[in-house]
């Protein structure tokens, strides 16, 4: 008989029950626990898997390009972006009747198609693509990259091409390479593409493989660059009357500092974007030459960390020992990377709608809503993952001897203070915010809405004014015509981005939306969610090695289950349990965030901000005027009289609820119930003629507590997000197309 799954663990492979299968899947990526693994082998496996990851990403983006080129309407959309709905791909579904075929044959298509709400049309158009042929070329190029990545992954698993452990531990070289080689050079390359291809295309000048060596991106060529007269490249920008994609009103500038938006496309000026990426490229290429490698010059990170000790002694040993702690722990490194990526992903969500970089994205409301929600949920998962790996670091990699009295040890030493402060903040926010909402609900219900407690967010309004919003009457900084931030001393010439002040005060974009009492309340509800999620995650990580109830968690690992009443009961005190509970809070917090964003924007887009302002100050307003009112199209998505192109979203809305509700079956029942049920079914099966001819290799047993919680959590999360995705897209698309 061949070896059983999982090959990486013989102990698990010999388990006679179905536990073998589930634990094999659960630990599939936990290379550290594999049989015969060495530290070097672990690093090599993870390194090679990165190439597989890249291959999947390239294949996926290639598929996007290919399907739009094959089944989409990119060339028609380019001719009239505001009035053409972009097609993602065709639908070939045997379940469709004639009515469905008619309903989904939309956007000028002759057969059923899906509408694209991902923003790829706007993205490709902005970066200079105009024809299906260019999309096909991109798809083929990415396929080749995908194949090369797969080959590279295979190659780096071969004995001659496996990097050794010291190569992986060389932090300075890796930093130089990632900062200068990856971030810096790729930003420079992107600047080059914008300057050489995208900006000329936006001015009606096609640049392709046939002529890119003949078309100079600027009439002055490289002379200003070499003579230091760089200001020439900022002169003569596109005018406010510029028609995107043509030479009407076009200028010649390639690097500008205009601020605000292109009046026609309502997106950032391409010349501003090019300038931004050039600045990033310069910064990162410089940063990529800062760290000491072969030549004995530059910074040593270890020396910097060891020297970073305040003279007053208030940080104890400071950062001594941290270099080796971080450099020898993959979980610490992954935690840092996930936290940084989580923040950046949330920033992408905020900036995609407030300062849209792609032409006409600001006019495609459903896509804006989809992109915001998509990026916020991804940010949430990345962030809880950061804390999970922080906890695993403390369980598996943390060495107290190596970190005596340094900043990390001191955080662990006063974890009670950190946890209790977070607890206090969460309680304060929770009671006060809910108290205000409930008070407002009661007075609304009793017919005295004038008795609501409505608080103007004056500090936030002041901050908006600082950035130039004039509505609130605070004359400060950018909202003060005499301020040094507006006008350089001794000149009447404004030094700020000239287009910024027009944009922030225009009212037809999402820059610094006008805020009032409803915003004040929901801001604090979101703050409650963020602080409570953080409390659970921080407590779970800081207590990962030991807590008041159970000071000896080290040998129990990251994800031990309830352990009976022996140590006073150990339910919900493993680091995994904290992660599990935090995910529910994370999902709810992002729920509130996306509800707020969507409802606020529906009012802005429809030109009716009064509904949000009046109804968002009490809970029934949210339930009735946001959730119920906007789900009515979905609840009636298909009925005895027929269906429409929202029917698939209506079905998905129901199906999402079903997946979500299924999660509770795993979350609310205890393991014994299922084990009893399985034993009964096994007994009946073995005594049923014919049926008992079928045998199993693994004895069926109930899921463990941790596994059932994971399955329940997965259903809860997937159902929750699928339900809201259907609601969001259908309610927005039904209003704006």
UniProtKB/Swiss-Prot annotation:
InterPro entries: PSI_PsaA/B (IPR001280), PSI_PsaA/B_CS (IPR020586), PSI_PsaA/B_sf (IPR036408), PSI_PsaB (IPR006244). Keywords: 4Fe-4S, Chlorophyll, Chromophore, Cyanelle, Electron transport, Iron, Iron-sulfur, Magnesium, Membrane, Metal-binding, Oxidoreductase, Photosynthesis, Photosystem I, Plastid, Thylakoid, Transmembrane, Transmembrane helix, Transport. It is found in: Plastid, Cyanelle thylakoid membrane. The chain crosses the membrane at residues 46-69, 135-158, 175-199, 273-291, 330-353, 369-395, 417-439, 520-538, 578-599, 646-668, 710-730. One of its GO terms (cellular component) is chloroplast thylakoid membrane. It is a multi-pass membrane protein. [4Fe-4S] cluster binds at residues 562, 571. The keyword Thylakoid applies. One of its GO terms (biological process) is photosynthesis. The keyword NAD does not apply. Chlorophyll a B3 binds at residues 665, 673. Phylloquinone binds at residue 674. Its EC number is 1.97.1.12. Its main location: plastid. It catalyses: reduced [plastocyanin] + hnu + oxidized [2Fe-2S]-[ferredoxin] = oxidized [plastocyanin] + reduced [2Fe-2S]-[ferredoxin]. Belongs to the PsaA/PsaB family. The PsaA/B heterodimer binds the P700 chlorophyll special pair and subsequent electron acceptors. PSI consists of a core antenna complex that captures photons, and an electron transfer chain that converts photonic excitation into a charge separation. The eukaryotic PSI reaction center is composed of at least 11 subunits. PsaA and PsaB bind P700, the primary electron donor of photosystem I (PSI), as well as the electron acceptors A0, A1 and FX. PSI is a cytochrome c6-ferredoxin oxidoreductase, converting photonic excitation into a charge separation, which transfers an electron from the donor P700 chlorophyll pair to the spectroscopically characterized acceptors A0, A1, FX, FA and FB in turn. Oxidized P700 is reduced on the lumenal side of the thylakoid membrane by cytochrome c6. This is Photosystem I P700 chlorophyll a apoprotein A2. It comes from Cyanophora paradoxa. The gene is psaB.
